């Protein structure tokens, strides 16, 4: 039967503690899910922060585009409603004109399809002056017509009245047509003015969005630079504190003489003594200083590299903003040139149409009326 001594218990506890520390160390190094040793956590944090900033910027841009699309849809709906109302008014005016000035009773061929023609028809002969008395009807013979001159004068007056009436109707129709064209031109000009105002509003909105994005990026760059400076300063202070603690602690300034263990003179306490001489300690100190300098140099290179990338991003954003402004300026110039060309073309067409109307609307003279009914046949 074995008896557990205090030394054996102490040794067993130390071995269990060492095994536990070893298991914890294996978990920190070989666990792929929770391992942070050998990885750049600072770069991971920067990547996560950049991804969040990108998501926020994309969300703001999408919201701005959605608001702009909503505004454009509203303007298109208003323009569509205005055009529908104009079409209804034009159709109503056409219907009123047809009902008031294009009645079936006013047609020249209405007597051929008049349902009351039999009721309106006259007898075979009313008097000697009846115009329907022909030679074949034997109702009136040559020399018996005493109202020949009066009838001829009446025919001329009637033809004159008909012509004047037709001329007045044509003039009125031409005036109505010119008025409709004038209203159409005014409506088109109003639509063009509304489109120009919308383009100006769109340009100002884009300028405000670009200015906000530029200010946001500038603030982010300043904040990132200040944060890196503070982190670097804190890291340097922590490194100096760690170096000072190591230089003045028991780990590096311990007694070079071996500390005998309670289990024998050939044993030493591992957590207190490493068994190194003065030369080995100086070599370790020199290596540590060199590693510190190398780490500081790498950090400085990384900081310089980050500043270069930030400067490149700022320059690229500035160049893209300048390019977008140039494109907007070119679009405005093209739109202005197109408007001027359309206005000149409209003026030329209006002058040409006015000349044609003036040339085709001359007043008839007495010679024009005297050429009708010059003979008996």
Curated annotation (Swiss-Prot):
GO CC annotation terms, alphabetical: axonemal A tubule inner sheath; axonemal microtubule; sperm flagellum
A family per Pfam: RIB43A
Keyword tags: Cell projection, Cilium, Coiled coil, Cytoplasm, Cytoskeleton, Flagellum
One GO BP: flagellated sperm motility
Subcellular location: Cytoplasm, Cytoskeleton, Cilium axoneme; Cytoplasm, Cytoskeleton, Flagellum axoneme
Keyword Cytoplasm: yes
Span list, region Disordered: 354-377
Coiled coil: 217-246
Subunit structure: Microtubule inner protein component of sperm flagellar doublet microtubules.
Family of the protein in this entry: Belongs to the RIB43A family.
Reported function: Microtubule inner protein (MIP) part of the dynein-decorated doublet microtubules (DMTs) in cilia axoneme, which is required for motile cilia beating.
Protein's UniProt name: RIB43A-like with coiled-coils protein 2
Organism: Mus musculus
Gene from which the chain derives: Ribc2
